[in-house]
UniProtKB/Swiss-Prot annotation:
Sorted UniProt keywords: ATP-binding, Helicase, Hydrolase, Initiation factor, Nucleotide-binding, Protein biosynthesis, RNA-binding
Chain ranges of the Helicase C-terminal domain: 252-413
Record-given protein name: Eukaryotic initiation factor 4A-15
Signal peptide segment: none
Keyword Mitochondrion appears in the UniProt entry: no
Higher taxonomy: Eukaryota, Viridiplantae, Streptophyta, Embryophyta, Tracheophyta
């Protein structure tokens, strides 16, 4: 389960700039390595032929902005801090960097990737396996909620890459089922979430068990001050690839709000929307597991076909629900922030924040589902009186204006 952010850690632009200035001040001026090369095609990156085959077979034609700048320094063994929003090809960036450097004849774990949720870890495992299809990569996901014995069996048979959540990975290292001797690459994905209070200590514990000379990659959609601070602890002159704060919201996603006078009127507002819009697929976010169940029951009682998933469900049930949603047999998914970072569905055209997120950072992970790789999408936020402060925080955080939902919203989908 993703850890909660530290008390009082809401993003503050001045705090961010102060921390960045500290890192770039006289004491920190040598902290970063500059790397300015941009590669307009995958062919120009000097990648192995069989890795290129995997990249093209996966459906990539041209590298995204983060891939143009991020794959090659990682392939060269440099430590990297990369900030890019959801849906920009961030996962494929570090997967390509890892796959390029593996010694495939050595069937030992050489790369360890940590992610904050099971769903995201499994998503990364799929991308790694697909891109490395022609290289013969052996990759496994070690995540909570699955059989420890099965993980131990797979690890003892030999793998090149382990992707996992911090708790299970630390457990495997502690039991010596995962041997760290040959690990030469360590990646933290969604570091903003991982380095919040819930996982910070576990990451330190894992890092202590890894070889001293190791390449570290930190990948994140947002870069709160604590994420920048912690990079000092275990990175060596990293290449820094940051997008400006005001570029963080995905282009192509239209964002609106609907004023709802009372919390209990949100349901009527939602049903009205579904009666007026032709929706391919949509995700509805609420803030608690109990509310997922409540809203699912209410929608079904009004003859809306919906699926629901949250952290109280066992892993097998969640996998089945996500498979149905990906295949399109289920068109509406109700969920919580916990799963926001593991949903990768190309057809999602609409995200509804039935509840606004409790932290501005999570807004990006939610609406980033609705327009991946330039696809158009719409995000609609339900806003009560109590939410007005958070709405203005979100607008300030991402430097965007979220407008009131127009009458012709159907034309936008």
């Amino acid at each position: 389960m993703a850890g909660a952010a530290p008390e009082g850690s809401q993003f503050d632009a001045r705090q961010f700039d102060t921390k960045m200035n500290e890192l770039l001040s006289a004491d920190g001026q040598d902290f970063f390595t500059s790397y300015d090369e941009v590669y307009d095609s995958f062919d120009a990156m000097g990648l192995q032929e069989n890795l290129l085959r995997g990249i093209y077979a996966y459906g990539f034609e041209k590298p995204s902005a983060i891939q143009q700048r991020g794959i090659v320094p990682f392939c060269k063994g440099l430590d990297v801090i990369q900030q890019a929003q959801s849906g920009t090809g961030k996962t494929a960036t570090f997967c390509s960097g890892i796959l390029q450097q593996l010694a495939y004849e050595l069937l030992e774990c050489q790369a360890l990737v940590l992610a904050p949720t099971r769903e995201l870890a499994q998503q990364i495992e799929k991308v790694m396996r697909a891109l490395g299809d022609y290289l013969g990569v052996k990759v496994t996901a070690c995540v909570g909620g699955t059989s420890v014995r099965e993980d131990q069996r797979i690890l003892s048979s030999g793998v090149h890459v382990v992707v996992g959540t911090p708790g299970r990975v630390f457990d495997m290292l502690r039991r010596q089922s995962l041997r760290p001797d040959h690990i030469k690459m360590f990646v933290l994905d969604e570091a903003d979430e991982m380095l919040s209070r819930g996982f910070k200590d576990q990451i330190y514990d894992i890092f202590q068990l890894l070889p001293p000379k190791i390449q570290v990659g930190v990948f994140s959609a947002t870069m709160p001050p604590e994420a920048l601070e912690i990079t000092r602890k275990f990175m060596n002159k990293p290449v820094r690839i940051l997008v400006k704060r005001d570029e963080l919201t995905l282009e192509g996603i239209k964002q609106f709000y609907v004023n709802v006078d009372k919390e209990e009127w949100k349901l009527e507002t939602l049903c009205d929307l579904y009666e007026t819009l032709a929706i391919t697929q949509s995700v509805i976010f609420v803030n608690t597991r109990r509310k997922v169940d409540w809203l699912t029951d209410k929608m079904r009682s009004r003859d809306h076909t919906v699926s629901a998933t949250h952290g109280d469900m066992d892993q097998n049930t969640r996998d089945i629900i996500m498979r149905e949603f990906r295949s399109g047999s289920s068109r509406v998914l109700i969920t919580t922030d916990l799963l926001a970072r593991g949903i990768d569905v190309q057809q999602v055209s609409l995200v509804i924040n039935f509840d606004l997120p409790t932290q501005p950072e999570n807004y990006l992970h939610r609406i980033g589902r609705s327009g991946r790789f330039g696809r158009k999408g719409v995000a609609i936020n339900f806003v009560t009186k109590d939410d007005e402060r958070m709405l203005s925080d979100i607008q300030r955080f991402y430097n965007v204006v979220i407008e009131e939902l127009p009458a012709n919203v159907a034309d936008l989908l």
